[in-house]
Amino acid sequence: MSKKFIQFIDGPNLNMLGEREPEIYGSMTLDEVHKTVKKYVAQNYKEIDVNFFQSNSEGDIVDCIHKSKNTASGLIINGGGFSHTSVAILDALLTIEIPKIEIHLSNLFRREDFRHHSYISKGVHGVICGFGPNSYCLLYTSPSPRDISGSRMPSSA
């Protein structure tokens, strides 16, 4: 039996975790978050493998989403600042029909008003935010892909 493959995408400035605003994002680096997720998945989900991609470039993120269409069983995205600005990432998410979850370390609704809206939320099945690095592992308590694969995505219009 082949393993399911989950693609994680981390957007701009997430490579600065541990240095950038630790009072908001915590002290763990992105590499430490990824190692924690890999360990958690290996211990609890033998049938799942994970891959991580981080970019500060919108186009690179769009390309990674497109590639995930044919390679991944699911996609987890922390769009960072692009969550609040990127129609291009939303459109890319709407082109793939695998289960998708948006995650954020901070609670967007306790932050500045401009962070309260995420364009990319329309292109995913669910959103997890506000649990710091634990947001990356909480998604494994969400419904399985078979539970959400039949749900309809809203129109981008």
For the regions a language model picked out, list residue spans one by one:
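N-terminal nucleotide-binding beta1-loop-alpha1 segment
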Residues: 8-15
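Flexible, gly/pro- and Lys/Arg-enriched active-site loops
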Residues: 79-82, 87-138
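Single conserved hydrophobic/aromatic residue that forms the stacking wall/gate
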Residues: 140-157
